[in-house]
Amino acid sequence: GVVFQDFKLLESKTVFENVAFALEVVNTPRHKLRKRVREVLRLVDLTEKAQSFPRELSGGQQQRVAIARAIANKPSLLIADEPTGNLDPDKSKEIIHLLERINEEEETTIIMVTHDVDVVNDHKKRTIALDQGYLVADLTQGGYISRNE
């Protein structure tokens, strides 16, 4: 699964339909599709927004819809490209905690790309730092990256 910084939601579809789309393209039977969409909307805490359209949601809610769609097919790997880039610090923390829950509950490996040093420093997982395309740090137990590195 892939999560983008700018959400990439289908504006003419509801939250439910956006998440269902990922299952429809792989011909998931309708009863399984509805069940899985409800499961992931519960996981991302958007059950009450199922019939809302993306334009009616906050940035944090839109990112949670994008995450729900990305995990609908139970991928073993989720790539999150700047998932907090368009969010304020509080919403960023919520998204990071959600990704950690998905890692644990869905048993999904998550690769997150970010330029936000605070997100990296708050996240106690393996951290790989690149500079100009070169590996400059590989902190296998997580840890802090100073703003000067």
Specify the residue positions occupied by each region the protein language model found.
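Short coil-to-helix segment of the ABC ATPase nucleotide-binding domain corresponding to the Q-loop/switch region
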Residues: 13-20
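ABC nucleotide-binding domain "signature" region
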Residues: 32-44
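Conserved ABC ATPase signature
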Residues: 53-57, 61-63
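Hydrophobic anchor residue at the start of the ABC signature
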Residues: 67
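Conserved catalytic motifs of ABC-family nucleotide-binding domains
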Residues: 74
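Catalytic Walker B motif of ABC-type/P-loop ATPase nucleotide-binding domains
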Residues: 78-81
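Helix N-cap at the start of a conserved alpha-helix in ABC-type nucleotide-binding domains
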Residues: 89-91
